[in-house]
Amino acid sequence: YLYIETHINAYYNPSLASSADAVKTVVSNNINAYADSSEMNKYGARFKYSRFQAIVDNSNQSITSNITKVEIRRDLKPALNQNAEYELCFGNPFYIRNNNGYNIKSSGFNIFGIADTVYLSDVPNNNSKNSKYGSLFLFKLQARQDPIVISANVGTIDYEKGEILIKPINIIGTSKKVQKISIIE
């Protein structure tokens, strides 16, 4: 599954709404109805950002605009304790926010031979926002915001196609579990 997570800031005219909670409730209800609709839950369905924003804007006459941040993710169920390669296809382009990397990030996991929890991230080739491709690397956190690269070139990323290819890696554990199954987000 492709998971879509949104962070919405809806702006509204308070004189046209009974309360902020009323606006929040109707926006939430409309988003949930859209998420549950056949438009979003059929094979080959596409998330349309402009359609989503229109649903938010049209939820209540008091809403004047919205700024919505969208994040997409896939849950990877790794083959534990064995070398395996992975391909994750998102079907949506990745935005290069930072030429120096860290545009995508995984949840934590453990690999054979490294005692620390590691994370997967990227760096665009040529350090350019116009780059179509990038490489993947593993890093650990020395402190809360102090990443240290553990291993470079562990895979590739195609920013235009939204595809991630991870070279053979021996994952021995993950920081996240869903119904007792180890996953990497």
PLM feature spans:
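Generic serine detector
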Residues: S15-S19, S28, S37-S38, S50, ...
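Hydrophobic beta-strand residues in large extracellular and virion-surface proteins
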Residues: V118-L120, L136, I164
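Polar low-complexity, Ser/Thr/Gly/Ala/Asp/Asn-rich disordered segments used for subunit assembly
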Residues: S62-T64, R73-D122, N126-N130, I172, ...
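Surface-exposed interaction regions enriched in Ser/Thr/Asp/Glu
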Residues: K132-Y133, K140-E185
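Acidic, low-complexity glycine/serine/threonine-rich segments
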Residues: Y1-E87, E160
